[in-house]
């Protein structure tokens, strides 16, 4: 098992798993010049190269450790939009009701605003969805995992008949 948010580079994660799972792979890697663990990507002065078609922006990568939990629900994680993982919702969600419920919590490093969107593919394709647009404001304080767990709980309480977990294949 790995933590949802671990702070390892891909090479470090590979070395860890190779050792802990006794895989025995002969790993080789090239250290990245100028990399500093205490820095965020924009501080390296290099362009953002999406690690996935669903993470086209650095901001999406910041909220991904929490928002990826939505893949296990029948909530849209924003796939089929230009800002996956920064957007989330479902047709039955009233954005302001959700935002009001979330105001009971304190979330540093993140501003959520009510939003309507229409995914072009994936969950709720071609349907108007109510939800939130997430704006990371301070990456060093942001805990997207905590936010998403609270948001899922709020949605399940506010719309218990509509909210559902995805069934395994």
Regions flagged by a language model, labelled:
Residues 22, 78-82, 127-129:
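Short gly/pro-enriched beta-turn/loop segments at secondary-structure junctions
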Residues 89-169:
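Conserved functional hotspot residues or short segments at active or partner-binding sites
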Residues 28-29, 86, 133:
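Structured core elements
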Residues 12-16, 86, 101:
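Alpha-helical scaffold segments in soluble metabolic enzymes
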Residues 1-65:
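Conserved anion/nucleotide-ligand pocket segment
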Residues 47-96:
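Active-site-lining helix/loop region of Rossmann-like oxidoreductase modules
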Residues 3-7, 88, 141:
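Hydrophobic alpha-helical scaffolding
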